[in-house]
Amino acid sequence: MMPEDEVTFRLAQLLLLLDAVAGQDAKGASLERIGYYDFLSANPFLVVDSDGREGNMLRLAGFDPQVLSYASSSQRFTSRRERIQHDLGLLVAYGCCEVHNRNGAFAYSINDRGRELGARFTATYAASFTTAASIVVRRLRKLSDKALREQTARWLRPDGEGGPGAALLSVLGPEPQAPDMPWEG
């Protein structure tokens, strides 16, 4: 069983994400945008160059750019996104976040109770995820919804630059080349 299969884990992760969103936009974010932020914060090397300053920060926080789970990113993105609405509904019901009408769409934001609860998380992963979420939200918040969808689709393509296929190739190496020997019959 994966941690993201546990409701408690997902709710805690969403609280940390909503807190990172509040640091960039106090009005919150849409369901769709939260879905992108959530997935990409858990897989930050799809967004961040592993050789840059932010890549170093992520490595220090415990993320590894060569983790093989990046190879199945698109499948995990789809299943995680389907759970987000349910999980946000639970956070609203528990009084940890609020939903508002923002330009005709729902926007979710953390409230004081959710912030207080999130501040009590002591797991190393909570600190790591908070670092990743802050970086990802800061990088992506200025993209329009359409640009965010398009960019994420490029990151999730197996053959995309810096995508899961590139991460897998960096671990496995290039495909074997045929020797320069003529076949004898």
Where is each model-derived feature located?
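Short acidic, glycine/Ser/Thr-rich loop/turn "cap" segments at secondary-structure junctions
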Residues: S69-Q75, G95-A105
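Winged helix-turn-helix DNA-binding recognition segment
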Residues: T78-S79
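Basic amphipathic alpha-helical segments that dock to polyanions
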Residues: L14, R83-G95
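Short, amphipathic alpha-helical interface elements at domain boundaries
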Residues: M1-S72
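Exposed, interaction-prone assembly regions rather than primary DNA-binding/catalytic cores
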Residues: A123-G185
